[in-house]
Regions:
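Acidic/histidine-enriched, beta-strand-rich ligand/metal-binding domains
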Residues: 169-198, 202-211, 215-219, 225-230, ...
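Short, Φ-rich (hydrophobic/aromatic) sequence segments
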Residues: 13-14, 182-187, 327
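Sequence/fold signature of self-assembling virion shell proteins
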Residues: 215-341
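Pocket-edge structural micro-motifs
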Residues: 21, 42-45, 51-56, 275-276, ...
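Hydrophobic alpha-helical segments and helix pairs
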Residues: 3-20, 147-177
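Assembly/oligomerization interface modules of large self-assembling protein complexes
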Residues: 30-98
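N-terminal alpha-helical "arm" segments
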Residues: 1-41, 332-341
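Long, contiguous amphipathic alpha-helices that act as assembly "spine/axial" helices in icosahedral shell
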Residues: 80-157, 180-183, 187-204, 315-321
């Protein structure tokens, strides 16, 4: 039996990464599950005139000529799945005390629950990536099980996606004399509503904070903006509230996802996002396409978890969670995305 260096285990730590669905929690608070495979935008209150621009992707290229506008859409279907291998129940779990070993039935239950947590996390990462991309670009590429990838374009105005260049780069400004406040106010004019929050990635925040004017103006005290403070409190270990810059909250987001075993940041380096915590982000979901779910009367649901066995020689057991997520912005111009340089 494989043993740790100490006979008595005091703690067992899973390999963790900084996943925290900040954009979902801050900007996507409404949820609309549908009983149909398609999401119908006209059935969402206040979105009668909204349409998505949908273009297929072939060999990595967006084919605009074959795309078009639609008010009904088929979300990609995701269904992460694991097998519960009987051999796994015979081995000690990482946090199991070697001097007080559990029985295989207990280990099986633990493995099933861990599988479900991993599957939920896999789907949540897809949702957060859609939400971040919607805010950053006003569009994203959607993929799913047996689903040809398509680009979902919410119609963001080009002026709301800004790249610093031509002498406007903050990295070229004198950090002791230059005040970036005027730049931020100019960027904010492109938003369709009031800006009350700015989200930076860590490198973007370091660049912003390098200006003396920023350090002088940043108010790190709490309590003066109660509603906004409520929105950004208890943000988690992947999010840091830095203070108020005038009447705008400054937040730094270092959330990560895992792709092919590699940890990656949701926000690109040197990103600044101007937005509003009251922006109307929508979590929409197509129906669950599973006969067992239909028999149970579960059609309109963000998730459908299942655990089942197949007969045979030998019998096999699996876990899976199914979902058809599509994150949308009612008004993509409520946000302004700036690539700092």
């Amino acid at each position: 039996m494989s043993m740790y260096t100490t006979a008595q285990l005091l703690a067992a730590n899973e390999q963790k990464f900084k996943f925290d669905p900040l954009f979902l929690r801050l900007f996507f608070r409404e949820s609309y599950p549908f009983t149909t495979e398609k999401v119908y935008l006209s059935q969402i209150p206040g979105l009668v005139n909204m349409a998505l621009y949908v273009s297929p992707i072939v060999s990595g290229e967006v084919i605009r000529s074959r795309g078009g506008s639609t008010s009904e859409f088929t979300p990609g279907y995701v269904k992460p799945k694991h097998e519960v291998n009987p051999q796994m129940t015979l081995r000690r779990l990482p946090d199991e005390d070697p001097q007080n070993l559990a029985d295989p039935a207990y280990r099986r239950r633990r493995i099933i629950m861990q599988n479900m947590r991993d599957e939920e996390l896999a789907i949540a990462q897809v949702e957060e990536m859609q939400a971040v991309s919607a805010v950053l670009k006003g569009k994203y590429t959607m993929t799913g099980e047996a689903f040809d990838p398509v680009e979902v374009d919410m119609g963001r105005s080009a002026a709301n996606n800004i790249t610093q260049s031509g002498g406007t780069e903050w990295s070229k400004r004198d950090k002791s004399t230059y005040d970036p406040t005027d730049d931020i106010e100019a960027y904010a004019l492109n938003a369709s509503g009031v800006v009350n929050i700015i989200v930076f990635d860590p490198k973007g925040w370091a660049l912003f904070r390098s200006f003396k004017a920023v350090r002088d103006k940043l108010d790190t005290r709490r309590g003066s903006h109660s509603e906004l403070e409520t929105a950004v409190k208890d943000l988690g270990k992947a999010v840091s509230y830095k203070g108020m810059y005038g009447d705008v909250a400054i937040v730094v987001y270092s959330g990560q996802y895992v792709e092919n075993g590699v940890k990656k940041n949701f926000l690109p380096d040197n990103t600044m996002v101007l937005g509003n915590t009251q922006a109307r982000g929508l979590r929409t979901y197509g129906c669950i396409q599973d006969a067992d779910a239909q028999r149970e009367g579960i059609n309109a649901s963000p998730r459908y978890p299942k655990n089942w066995k197949t007969s045979g020689d030998p019998a096999r057991e699996f876990t899976m969670i199914q979902s058809a997520p599509l994150m949308l912005l009612a008004d993509p111009d409520e946000f302004v995305s700036v690539q700092l340089a």
